[in-house]
């Protein structure tokens, strides 16, 4: 499970934007995204698909709904999308809501 906080290119949650006061969180997500690319290359010849998924700003902490967090069920859709990719689906990418996010 990744986060837009681990992206240089995500205009909403990217490293240079939202989490600048808590950089460790974004840096750990950036490392996870790098591991995603490495493992996707390692398993390229297999049917295993390895992707990072950002569920978006999701209400997993009490009170975050008032900050505009989406319901957990909405965030889960991104995870299910990635888990159910067909054999010819993408691998080594970073996605939210089934759409690619820039690294």
Give the role of each language-model region.
Residues 1-44, 64:
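Catalytic loop of short-chain dehydrogenase/reductase
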Residues 30, 45, 52-55, 60, ...:
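C-terminal helical subdomain
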Residues 1-3, 49-54:
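Structural signature of the Rossmann-like NAD(P)-dependent dehydrogenase/reductase core
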């Amino acid at each position: 499970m990744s986060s837009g906080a681990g992206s240089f290119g995500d205009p909403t949650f990217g490293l240079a934007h939202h989490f600048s006061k808590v950089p460790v969180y974004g840096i750990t997500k950036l490392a996870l995204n790098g591991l995603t690319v490495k493992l996707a290359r390692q398993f390229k010849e297999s049917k295993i698909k390895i992707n990072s998924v950002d569920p978006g700003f999701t209400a997993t902490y009490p009170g975050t709904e008032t900050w505009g967090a989406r319901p957990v069920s909405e965030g889960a859709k991104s995870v299910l999308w990635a888990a159910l990719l067909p054999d010819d689906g993408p691998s080594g990418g970073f996605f939210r809501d089934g759409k690619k996010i820039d690294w």
